[in-house]
């Protein structure tokens, strides 16, 4: 300690004098005998005390003041020598005061050795500091130039492009035609039914039944059906190479009228010659009886055929294995036909007959007839290209936008929220089969839309273009231009004198699409060479080759070859992919537009900010480079480059001193002084004194000073909070929430995606899907179930209540007569209903089995009664007296005689002759009356005047003839006499 004091109090201190005059009482100095700590400001000042004493005062003060200063310094140094040694670095307090420290000077520093005692001055300095509770602090060494960087030069900003070649127009979308080709056909056949019945003694049974259909000959169709509306009862058919004949009812051939069927399906009409099936049963039992029924049937049904139209089906269930477009013309001979040539017949100018109205058609047609083993089919022939089409119209689009993107066209249709993608090359309709209808329908639909909506505002800029989109949709598109844009084009053409190029300017894609395919060369395209004398051999060869090419083309059907090479367009059953494509394109366009605008704006802003960075780095290179690298660095400009060093994070404690005044009374620190340790748990000897920089940066030196000013107020960021100094003295901590924030950021205003609803669309309706098959099975099933009811015993199946119809007619008649007539009609209908009900009841009773038995018994009883009546009548005719008056018989006479005591052998001489004569007269009179009644009835029946006159005369004669009949007495005189 003495040596330290002597070294300090040597010649070095002899010339020292203070810089600021008298020391202030609140300034604390810590003279230390030992070597000062590294980085200590007091130690550095004491170490340079000799220099301070040797340096003359700038104000040129007298030597007497210097001597006083030297004496005061010696006293201070002498006092410090007698103090015990203390650590050079103060230990941090256990607690961080928020204001001026009020701790006792008797606190013992735990970092001191047991033999050491704390320095009160150092404890005062230490306890007057503020510990940083949170936040990261960094210390940055000065850059030396070992690491240099430069600022990137300006970039080229991208330019955003919405698309290329946007074109608006009208379009018609076609889809695959899955519906069959439908037409009407007539079916002619004779239904033959051969029945075999066994006749027993008391029963009849059906032992066999043969049913077959045979075709009607074409000659019979011409001569009878379509000429007279009749059909023959004879049927000829070939079975097992044998010609068979059948006759209706097993009788001779006759012509029968064709009558409408009583029961027909909605999609067909039918006519036949009979409704009943003949079943003959003879009178002789124990035999088989065979009968034949021939029913001539004509049906008008619906026929269907699907691509490639090599056959067609009828609603009767029959399939004809020939194309409906087959014919004898040149273009129709190539169609498919599986039947022999003699089975087919085509008639030009044919006029069929309507079997309902019995009238022939006014316009002649071309009729085809095909005879199959069971039926003859006829239909009207039409050209294939006119009737059949493999594509059908799906949607008419009145607003469509086409844009070119990455070598493809995108057709956007907002009305159905769909986007279709196709190649930029137009689709040739000739490459697909049977597409002649597309161009016609597309042109008509586009012209109709244009006249309704765009005729006054737009003009067409090209012809109809065809594109095959993904999914099998054919788009017929015709581009348009608004009138204003068309005028601009015309003005540009007139200005550049290119009026001949108007079409190419309005539609620049027309030439590209039309010239994309190279025309194939052929010998047919070479003109026929003319032989010359100079090159006869060469010309002959060319002539021969040309002729072979023509013959090959003529011999091989061009349509058939083309049909093999053509490919049918297949369309998907859903357009969900197109709707998703529309949604994706919509989102993609919006997002890409926003991102591209952001990228362009960001790049432009970066280029502008780069200039600002380049200028600001000259002012504060460390802050600029740290913000650029997003890392704490220390920087220094070295010409056109920047030298940097990386900052180290302070892991130890940082203490902020509560005073910003330096030892000079006129000089103060511009940033607060701090004391810190690099690592944690460091002792007092490892503490470093520095100065607080910006953004929690710690300087290892205290070089930031300024002249002291009055009413000074400063806020400094210390950790995560701010500290407030007033007049270079710490006042309090300030939370960040008490300080209002001003934002330097530019808000990015982005537009949200607009709502887009997906519309449910059906490419094929349920009716179309149900109608795709070759056969309508519901129609076939209905027809087959009703076939028997349609032609056989229809009267026993279809019961029509004629009584109800008659009653309804009578009721309508009486109802038209007014209220009185309606009342009378009610009574009449009630009575008639009772009668009808009675008759219906009797009929129902007769149809009942018990009723039939009762009727049989009644018939037998009637026969017995008739037999006895017949015997009685015969008895009257043979012996009327005996029959009418049995008392006159011989038995009665004998009985009477016996009663009077006479024998049977006695004669009848005692019989009363008068009574007998009266009886004879009575019988005679009765016979005359009977004859007279018969004569009168005949006269009345014949309405003959002569007979009536004769009858009246006979009546007069009978009235005047003879005495009148007198009644016999009840008692016999003989009996009376006997009783007396």
From Swiss-Prot:
Residues 794-847, 823-843 are annotated as: Hydrophobic membrane proximal region. Its main location: virion. Residues 871-980 are intravirion. It comes from Equine herpesvirus 1 (strain AB1) (EHV-1). The gene is gB. Disulfide bonds join 140-647, 157-603, 231-296, 389-437, 668-708. Residues 96-118, 505-516 have a biased composition (Low complexity). GO terms for cellular component: host cell endosome membrane; host cell Golgi membrane; host cell plasma membrane; membrane; viral envelope; virion membrane. The chain crosses the membrane at residues 850-870. This is Envelope glycoprotein B. Residues 1-86 form the signal peptide.
